[in-house]
Amino acid sequence: MGPQLIKYFKMKQKLGQPIRNDGPKWQIEAKKGTPTMGGTLILLALTVSVLLWTDIYNIYTWLILFITLSFGLIGFIDDYLKLKNYSFKGLSGKIKIIIQSIVAFIFCYLLIVFSEQSNTQLLFPIFKNLYLDLGYFWFIFGIFVIVGSSNSVNLTDGLDGLAIVPIMIVLATFSIISYLVGNAIYSDYLNITYISGVGEITIFCAAFIGAGLGFLWFN
């Protein structure tokens, strides 16, 4: 499906991704005509894999899929505007952060409402009984972490997999963490808080890594 999507994007985009003129000339020339919206391929492969292999009755499956696809949609709109105006300027930074913050707030709210073990406490690894109750500030903290993490990826983004490789490294780390936290035996042995059902995030991370590797093959 990858080659077909790439051909479709090339046909529709024609001129390809708008390139900034502040880089080396050889790089600007080499990248002319490069299609954008490659994240569509990643999200499509990820969504199919998650729906096939994760527990669809697990609340964490839907929450993490919701925020991933929501932020993916924001990126899609940003790329679409760049192509429409053929400019490297898409959504303004202010509008993008506002939309991201709204999505992050909805995610945090749903996490509190639908997850039985979720609360406003910030837990510290290894120190099992050490925690800080953030109260309503927990929402601000959650929004800051989610939006900040998303935009830190944007800062490293490029045309040669500069963003997806660090993402896969982080995903590999979180897959281990979610597995240990979601396993009653290992979490007790390592003196970390056990959260029932969160192990499904491990499958999500693995699916995301696989989708990222597939993206790199065509990148």
Each language-model region and where it sits:
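Active-site His/Glu-centered metal-binding helix of metallohydrolases
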Residues: 77, 81, 102, 159
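Membrane interface segments of multi-pass transport proteins and intramembrane proteases
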Residues: 82-92, 123-132
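Alpha-helical transmembrane segments
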Residues: 1-13, 44-73, 107-113, 118-122, ...
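Cytosolic, membrane-interface loops and tails of multi-pass inner-membrane proteins
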Residues: 4-31, 80-89
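Select subsegments of transmembrane alpha-helices in polytopic membrane proteins
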Residues: 31-43, 94-103, 201
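Short, amphipathic, aromatic/basic-enriched membrane-interface segments that mark the entry/exit
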Residues: 29-37, 130-135, 196-199
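Cytoplasmic juxtamembrane interface segments
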Residues: 36-37, 73-88, 143-145
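Membrane-interfacial loop-to-helix junctions in multi-pass inner-membrane proteins
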Residues: 32, 57-65, 84-99
